[in-house]
Amino acid sequence: MQGLYSILISVVFNLSVSACATEGDTKLVALDGHQDGDGIATFAGGCFWCTEAIFERVEGVKDVYSGYTGGKEDNPTYNQVSYGRTTHAEAIQIVFDPKVVSYQELLDIFFATHDPTQLNRQGPDRGAQYRTAAYYHSNDQKMAIEATIKKIDASGTFTNKVVTQVEAYSKFWMAEDYHQDYYELNPGNPYIIQVAIPKVKKLKKYFPGKIKAKYKAEK
């Protein structure tokens, strides 16, 4: 029975990863819709269910959107992106208050909560759509990203070099509605339990002073 149980868990886990591969509506995000003074950060670090949940818990972050960026196709869908049928990556766009949390602090969290040395994969997810990338909105952001990568490589934190792509921001397509707040709305999903929750715990371990009050008691 133990062997059968393990097989069933594996099947359920794999189904949970692919179950969302259905067509839906995506929206092109207009950056001018945010309040004056807001900062914008755009990162790709594997499955956006994980990265969205991480940054939603960071003090000073006002909104996090899951979506697609870094590719050339218009109106990409989850079905297309998740199966590698576009040049886009799963990504998140963060709206933050720079008076509370700096772009550098967001960068530090980004690099600490995923493996930036893995090329075209993160954990169980494989393919260029799960690549690590940081999309800069200004020259200051570009310099901060490059300096952070250089610092990480020099530190010897990882055996391999950082492969995070540093690219100018172009467009961000917001993912289908059912992907937004996926972590919060699907706590029993095997992928959330096995992959996303450990990443959120890593955030809390390394950045305890940056957690929003409402998430401090979260297990």
Where are these regions (language model features)?
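Bacterial N-terminal signal peptides
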Residues: 2-18
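Flexible coil/turn and secondary-structure edge motifs
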Residues: 15, 19-219
